[in-house]
Amino acid sequence: MIRDIFEVPDVEHQGDIDHFTGIIQDAGGEILKVNWSGEEDDAAYIVYQCQDKNHQKQILDKLENE
């Protein structure tokens, strides 16, 4: 299993986080933790794991194209 962290800058509301966690899950990743202060315009960090480097690349490609 591969673990990774994705930073979501300038989160305005929970819907922003839900959007990116959904992309990760749809691509086969498992969300382990989300760290966000709850403050508008603050960054959030999504910790996730996936099967291998190939899945990690697919997830990152989808996240970066958003």
Predicted regions and their residues:
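A common structural junction motif
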Residues: 26-29, 61-66
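Short, surface-exposed beta-strand/loop "edge" segments at domain boundaries and coil↔beta transitions
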Residues: 14, 53-58
